[in-house]
């Protein structure tokens, strides 16, 4: 999973803001981590429970932050359940990001904070490259896809690859639309899931050409 902020470069260009950026990023990072580890989150009266997701690696990638997660579970159904819950939480956070900014107003010296957070998420095999200092780097196609999804359209705040396990069984039932990302660099035939609200809004903009809606057959369970 990779996330970044709308107009983060502009945020960094505010005069003499750099000493305060760390506090802002740590605040956001804490909320994203609590989506995994559990705990209090903005706008919710009760704490989130922890998910069976292990954070293997976190690093800045350009102007975004990459999380490499190991998905736990006894079988594919368990792993799918963990990813489903994580996706729901990511969408919740992006929908309530203004509350994170309201929290940041307590210590930030300026009001012009990034207005939106954007997520790109996928699933796949990565290769671990151990380093002599005891840390590891990771490489693999999944990282490339997540980065491209997160940057694909500035008007979209959440894109999930259809490579997520069993995504076809739960994404469209939970407020997502399956579309083809027609101009995704290197993979113009990649299927992705987009938040239904985002998709409705983007169809009214010039970025509508970035997505091709597909007609899905009715699932066997829905046939009478």
Residue ranges and their predicted role:
Residues 149:
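Extracellular/oxidizing-compartment recognition motifs
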Residues 11, 68, 129, 167-168:
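Residues that scaffold the ATP/ADP-binding catalytic core of kinase and kinase-like folds
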Residues 1-88:
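Catalytic NTP-binding/metal-coordinating core of nucleotidyl cyclase/transferase enzymes
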Residues 82-101:
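Extracellular-facing segments of soluble proteins and assemblies that are Gly/Ser/Thr-biased and enriched
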Residues 43-81, 99-141:
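Catalytic core of nucleotidyl cyclases, primarily class III adenylyl/guanylyl cyclases
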Residues 154-224:
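Intrinsically disordered, glycine/charged-rich C-terminal tails and inter-domain linkers
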Residues 143-144, 185:
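C-terminal or late-domain output modules
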Residues 6, 124-126, 144, 163:
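Alpha-helix/helix-capping structural signal
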């Amino acid at each position: 999973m990779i996330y970044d902020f709308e107009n983060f470069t502009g945020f960094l260009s505010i005069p003499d803001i750099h000493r305060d950026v760390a506090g802002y990023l740590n605040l956001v990072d804490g909320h994203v981590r609590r989506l995994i580890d559990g705990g209090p989150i903005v706008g919710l009266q009760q704490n989130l429970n922890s998910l069976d997701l292990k954070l293997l690696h976190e690093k800045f990638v350009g102007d975004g932050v990459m999380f490499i997660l190991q998905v736990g579970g006894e079988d594919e159904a368990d792993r799918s359940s963990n990813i489903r819950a994580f996706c729901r939480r990511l969408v919740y956070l992006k929908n309530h990001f203004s509350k994170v900014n309201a929290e940041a107003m307590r210590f930030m010296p300026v009001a012009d904070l990034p207005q939106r957070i954007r997520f790109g998420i996928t699933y796949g095999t990565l290769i671990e490259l151990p380093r002599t200092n005891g840390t590891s780097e990771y490489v693999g196609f999944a990282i490339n896809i997540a980065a491209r999804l997160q940057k694909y359209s500035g008007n979209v705040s959440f894109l999930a690859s259809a490579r997520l396990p069993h995504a076809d069984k739960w994404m469209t039932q939970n407020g997502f639309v399956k579309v083809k990302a027609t101009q995704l660099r290197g993979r113009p035939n990649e299927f992705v899931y987009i938040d239904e609200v985002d998709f409705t809004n983007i169809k009214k903009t010039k970025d509508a050409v970035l997505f091709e809606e597909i007609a899905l057959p009715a699932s066997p369970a829905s046939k009478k």
